[in-house]
């Protein structure tokens, strides 16, 4: 019984300050949940993807700035209308679905439309992943801007197979991001495998490296959380999903007798790697290595390893760092002609490293019912942290083909 304002034993006492803090914490949690589920920047992604398509695809095609490898792919699409089979009669190191797209579009405006749709899808799933993992929509928007600028420059005139594969790569990552954010929910891994299979038939080697990176992310996270059984289930579910897509499409190469040629052509860039006998090694190391440093890859790699992060972000950094380093090594050891667009293969890994570099906001009390989270700009940190050298790299990659052709 309460007499003269005194509380009986067992009845909790909540001073005004504690009640006020509890209300604020509840409001902050509600605001964070609402932030994660609303405000998809549809119009921004639509415009950015259109801009990137025009810069990376339309402008090089109109002015004859397409890379030799990409021009060969366009020629293959035209030649398939005349006669012959891909892989048997014409060389191709990309996937079967990619050459089907080239065949259907014949290098016309339809291919640019397909690239636009692919870039829109990539931006959609990238934003979804960033929002799921961090809940910081402002920095996720800045990540989209950096991503599209990098695609426009690194994909200028070539590596379109990687670009059209990115929505499937980022869709697979978005499903894994859902699991990393909420380990209780590990559904959707069948779709992870199916999405990676579709990406494989567009751009095989980058997809295999990205799949390896995702596997390392899950392995590291499951070890940290002691979820070994879940890891086995995820592996077999992903493998089943991959098989559902791989075998029906791959069966076409068996029927046409091009299976062996398809494997050899796909692995040709890897089979011809050289160290001591590679006359282009020094040029490759200087060109790709310098661009990698100027783009800030060293900073991203070091920060991904050194800075303390939650388990989910640290797991992402392990896979992304390994995928990035292996991709750079393949470029340096390659005997293929130098071209800036070949660096587009690093984009999926570089984007993930940028994603985990988000800074946590510092909450400040604005009123009894609101809190505003102020976070530093991802765009400014990326540029200032690398002394604005990424701007130099972007301008260089955009104007180098122009100077090489017309001057």
What is the role of each PLM region?
Residues 61-76, 86-101, 257:
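Extracytoplasmic catalytic/substrate-binding loops of multi-pass membrane glycan-assembly enzymes
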Residues 335-379, 387-393, 403-406:
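Hydrophobic/aromatic-rich transmembrane helices and adjacent perimembrane loops
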Residues 134, 169-191, 225, 299-313, ...:
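Membrane-interface transmembrane helices that cradle and orient dolichyl/undecaprenyl
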Residues 188-204, 210, 215, 325-333:
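Membrane-interface alpha helices of multi-pass inner-membrane proteins
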Residues 112-135, 171, 175, 302-304:
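Transmembrane-helix motifs of polytopic, lipid-linked glycan transferases
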Residues 123-153, 166:
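Transmembrane-helix signature of polytopic, membrane-embedded enzymes
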Residues 99, 108, 145-167, 201, ...:
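Aromatic- and kink-enriched transmembrane "portal" helix at the membrane-lumen/periplasm boundary
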Residues 209-243:
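Perimembrane helix-loop-helix junctions
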């Amino acid at each position: 019984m309460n007499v003269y304002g005194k509380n009986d034993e067992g009845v909790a006492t909540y001073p005004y300050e504690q009640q006020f803090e509890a209300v604020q914490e509840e409001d902050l949690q509600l605001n964070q949940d609402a932030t994660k589920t609303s405000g998809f920047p549809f119009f921004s992604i639509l415009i950015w993807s259109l801009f990137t398509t025009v810069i990376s695809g339309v402008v090089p095609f109109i002015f004859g700035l397409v890379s030799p490898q990409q021009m060969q792919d366009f020629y293959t699409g035209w030649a398939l209308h005349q006669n012959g089979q891909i892989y048997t009669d014409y060389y191709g190191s990309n996937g079967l679905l990619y050459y089907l797209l080239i065949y259907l579009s014949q290098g016309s405006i339809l291919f640019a439309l397909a690239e636009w749709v692919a870039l829109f899808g990539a931006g959609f799933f990238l934003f979804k992943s960033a929002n799921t993992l961090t809940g910081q929509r402002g920095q996720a928007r800045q990540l989209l801007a950096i991503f599209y600028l990098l695609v426009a420059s690194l994909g200028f005139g070539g590596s379109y197979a990687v670009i059209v594969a990115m929505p499937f790569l980022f869709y697979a990552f978005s499903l894994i991001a859902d699991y990393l954010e909420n380990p209780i929910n590990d559904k959707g891994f069948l779709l992870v495998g199916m999405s990676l299979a579709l990406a494989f038939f567009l751009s095989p080697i980058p997809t295999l490296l990205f799949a390896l990176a995702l596997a390392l992310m899950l392995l590291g996270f499951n070890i940290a959380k002691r979820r070994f059984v879940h890891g086995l289930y995820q592996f077999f579910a992903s493998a089943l999903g991959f098989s559902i897509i791989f075998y029906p499409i791959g069966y076409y190469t068996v029927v046409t007798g091009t299976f062996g040629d398809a494997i050899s052509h796909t692995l040709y860039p890897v089979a011809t790697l050289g160290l001591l006998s590679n006359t282009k090694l020094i040029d490759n190391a200087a060109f790709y290595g310098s661009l990698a440093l100027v783009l800030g890859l060293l900073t991203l790699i070091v920060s991904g390893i050194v800075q303390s992060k939650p388990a989910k972000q640290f797991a992402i950094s392990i896979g992304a760092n390994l995928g990035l380093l292996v991709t750079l090594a393949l470029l340096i050891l390659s005997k293929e002609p130098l071209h800036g667009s070949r660096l587009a293969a690093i984009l999926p890994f570089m984007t993930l490293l940028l994603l985990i570099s988000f800074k946590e906001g510092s909450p400040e009390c604005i009123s009894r019912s609101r809190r505003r989270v102020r976070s530093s700009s991802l765009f400014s940190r990326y540029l200032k942290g690398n002394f604005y050298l990424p701007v130099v790299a972007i301008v260089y990659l955009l104007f180098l083909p122009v100077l090489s052709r017309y001057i």
